[in-house]
């Protein structure tokens, strides 16, 4: 009888643990679904604006009214709007790939990856007359998904270039080095001449978050750049932060 009581007690404990885990899993699924709904609601809102602009331009040109008689001007504006929409759709596809694809890492020379990304951005940096300071070792290897890390470096560099004012003395500084132990790396990208309100820092990795309402439309950003960076770094188990420095903004991560 005593043994039966122990077995029953053990079974009840296991059932209780299983129920608690089930509740936890259900709650987690609810949170994920809530985030997914919020994300697609934001996507719908973000696409609605350029579609409305396009519709207005095309309607005005077809009717030939007022300022819309200058068809070449509004055709150019319409093309720019569709290019922004195309950029957003590409970023949305990236989000989908990150969420659905099997995450595979391999030993990768991320120093070479970062150098190539900087070379690709050289013209953008020169066009804004920004100073570029680079400190990258000849080689630095890490177990990463190389395609996804390319996206991290690309988004971070583009973000720094877009939001650095075109003023004399402003610069972008890129640092890559071994981390505090031999298995990790540390990367830092800093841009000067701009600051982010402290209350906005915690929201920067949210999809479509804007520090200022007009910021993305002025700079051409999709509103998904840092959100994608966050997703990729989370999958790599990396730690990261973004904050103000004495003369600008700095993003850093370790993995």
Model-derived features with residue positions:
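Primarily the dimerization/phosphotransfer
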Residues: 27-61
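Short alpha-helical segment of the dimerization/phosphotransfer core of two-component systems
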Residues: 77-85
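Coiled-coil phosphoacceptor/dimerization helix of two-component systems
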Residues: 84-96
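Conserved signal-transmission helix
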Residues: 6-35
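Conserved glycine-rich
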Residues: 237-238
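Short conserved segment of the HATPase_c
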Residues: 196-210
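Conserved catalytic submotifs in the C-terminal HATPase_c
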Residues: 106, 126, 131-141
């Amino acid at each position: 009888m005593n043994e039966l009581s122990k077995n029953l007690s053990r079974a009840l404990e296991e059932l209780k643990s299983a129920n608690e885990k089930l509740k936890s899993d259900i709650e987690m699924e609810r949170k994920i679904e809530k985030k997914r709904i919020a994300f697609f609601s934001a996507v719908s809102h973000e696409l609605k604006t350029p579609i409305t602009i396009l519709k207005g331009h095309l309607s005005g040109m077809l009717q030939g009214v007022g300022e819309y008689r200058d068809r070449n001007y509004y055709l150019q504006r319409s093309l720019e709007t569709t290019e922004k929409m195309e950029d957003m759709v590409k970023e949305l596809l990236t989000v989908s790939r990150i969420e659905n694809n099997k995450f595979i890492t391999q030993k990768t020379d991320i120093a070479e990856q970062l150098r190539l990304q900087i070379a690709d951005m050289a013209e953008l940096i020169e066009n804004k007359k920004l100073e570029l300071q680079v400190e990258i070792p000849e080689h630095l290897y890490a177990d990463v998904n190389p395609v996804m890390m390319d996206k991290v470096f690309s988004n971070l560099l583009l973000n720094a270039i877009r939001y650095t004012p075109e003023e004399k003395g402003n610069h972008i500084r890129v640092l890559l080095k071994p981390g505090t132990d031999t298995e990790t790396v540390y990367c830092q990208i800093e841009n000067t001449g701009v600051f982010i309100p402290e209350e906005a820092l915690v929201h920067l990795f949210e999809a479509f978050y804007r520090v200022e309402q007009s910021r993305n439309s002025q700079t051409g950003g999709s509103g998904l750049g840092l959100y994608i960076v966050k997703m990729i770094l989370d999958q790599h188990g990396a730690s990261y932060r973004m904050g103000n420095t004495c003369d600008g903004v700095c993003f850093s991560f370790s993995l």
